[in-house]
Amino acid sequence: MSQQYFVIDNGSYNIKAGFSNQDAPIKHQNALSKARDGLIYVGNEYLVQTNNYSGMIFKRPYDHGHLISWETEKAVWDYTFNKASPNQELDASITHLTLTETPFQLPQLSMNTDQIVFEEYGFNEYYRCAPASLVPWSNLGSSESKNNDFTLVVDSGYSGTWIVPIIYQNVYWKGVKKLPIGGAALNGLLREIISFRHYDIADEPVLINTIKEKTCFMATDFEKSLANRKKYRCEFILPDFKTTTTGFVKTKDTPIDTTGDVQSLALIDERFTIPESFYHPEIIFDNTTSSTSTIQNASFKNITDLVVECIMSCPKVTQPLLSGNIITVGGNTNLPGFTDRLRHELVKELPIDWHVQVKETEHNPDEASWFGGAQLTNDEIINNISISKKDYFEHGSNWCQKQFGFKNL
């Protein structure tokens, strides 16, 4: 049989996976979940097997972006492989696996992953890389593919935001920057503010994430929005697990039974203050009660400063080229106004004679890396950068790290 190609974008919140010839990946939570009745669910099983998400507890294999628990991850991967191949059998012995992992992953954790790939599952060939390095490939075939030699990727996910320069299809590691603010930090801040101002929702992770996704946005001008905050007021109807299991935003056309026990949240400045943490990290300092968080114990710059630092740390001749091809990906970039705000701030900070272009991919922002990985498998270069199972057992586990690990050039 001919070789198959399987791509996994192994995010700390969602997994995107599938054969490279699929039209789109399957996407589900990278977690085990436990309901109040004690039942354990894998991935998105809880969405179809229960209609009460209240008090759901999630156990994720990632901590601060690092894959630390293969005991959890293997159960999720088994679920993924079963979901991804209902019509096409996954035979690892003839399958090439493209897998993403966080930049600057600890070498021992990467070696654990390599061991699972080759020794547990027995994949035939393997390529491991940072998610951002696949993003330029996702634009191949588009009218802008000619610009892919110099790309700066802003990947804002669940555990943090990475700014990664890609030069001639290689990560320029000296320029990589990280802002430790991502979806998890936004959810935590939203949880504490709502619990203080309205209802205690500390044990409602599904509800918190739903409120963020349906109501929050990035303000173009934070000070102006704050001064006119009342016009951004919206009412979020909380789930009663009879008429709605997730809750929804009330509109003029929303029919609501006013005689029932309807509970709602009136959200005003929370809608844009939470995402503003990307530009004013002090918002988190002022509103969080955690004393163990990385964010609490470390000072860091905002996203604009880090993008500028990233560009300036790259070779001088590439700097204006990178500023003209900035791509935003990751779940947080689904926030309305995220890309426009970043463009607005960078124009003020970068040289006036540079062209500044910040754009989104043609795909769903949190699926861009998967589509890039699928496109990469169609290029002959995949044969030069992959490691076979034979190479792994012949040279040992360090061989993968030499090939795939980050380079301090």
Swiss-Prot record:
Main function: Component of the SWR1 complex which mediates the ATP-dependent exchange of histone H2A for the H2A variant HZT1 leading to transcriptional regulation of selected genes by chromatin remodeling. Involved in chromosome stability.
Protein's UniProt name: Actin-like protein ARP6
Main location as per UniProt: cytoplasm
Subunit structure, as described in the record: Component of the SWR1 chromatin remodeling complex.
Pfam family, one: Actin
Cellular compartments per GO CC: cytoplasm; cytoskeleton; Swr1 complex
Family under the similarity heading: Belongs to the actin family. ARP6 subfamily.
Keywords assigned: Activator, Chromatin regulator, Cytoplasm, Cytoskeleton, Nucleus, Transcription, Transcription regulation
Subcellular location: Cytoplasm; Cytoplasm, Cytoskeleton; Nucleus
CDD domains noted in UniProt: ASKHA_NBD_Arp6
UniProt KW Ribosomal protein keyword: no
InterPro entries, A to Z: Actin (IPR004000), ATPase_NBD (IPR043129)
Protein origin, superkingdom: Eukaryota
Keyword Ribonucleoprotein: no
Biological process according to GO: chromatin remodeling
